[in-house]
A protein has these predicted regions:
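Rossmann-like dinucleotide-binding domain for NAD(H)/NADP(H)
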Residues: 1-70, 116, 146
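A conserved regulatory-domain signal marking ACT and ACT-like small-molecule sensing domains
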Residues: 58-146
Length: 146
């Protein structure tokens, strides 16, 4: 959090943190006091950590909302964002079945254009399966949680 904001909309914002791989910069998020900024920063950080670890997007504004339990011990979680069109889940299920991978839990939430599916599976098989999910024409982004 920076105590001073750019002078106007569209004004350049420069910081040495901008190019670092382990830093996420957020826009102004509404704190008018240092205490409020600290509380908001902690809240945003916790939400980002929950998304990174578990795939939870419970309070998202412009993304399908999913509030997930922690992945059960021994299972692995795949997070897959794709265009909301017919047949995507069928393609994903076919790839997993051909690899002999069992789906233990599946969570799907969609909005008009975007779907977010979370799969808890018993294993990943080889890298070819993940590459296959990533290369699907409808895939926007795919990753393994954790």
């Amino acid at each position: 959090m920076f105590p001073e904001e750019p002078a106007e909309n569209g004004a350049g914002f420069r910081t040495p943190l901008a190019g670092l791989d382990n830093v996420i910069l957020t826009p102004h998020i509404g704190g008018s006091t240092e205490e409020a900024q600290e509380a908001i920063a902690l809240d945003v950080g916790e939400k980002l950590a929950r998304f990174w670890r578990h795939g939870t997007t419970a309070t998202a504004v412009n993304f399908p909302q999913v509030d997930l339990p922690q992945v059960k011990e021994g299972l692995l979680r795949i997070l897959h964002v794709h265009r909301n069109v017919p047949g995507v889940l069928g393609k994903m299920h076919t790839l997993l079945a051909k690899a002999g991978i069992n789906i233990h839990a599946e969570f799907l939430q969609s909005d008009r254009d975007t779907s977010f599916v979370i799969l808890d599976v018993d294993r990943f098989g080889d890298r070819a399966l993940l590459d296959g999910l990533e290369r699907m024409d409808e895939t926007v982004r795919m990753r393994v949680a954790g």
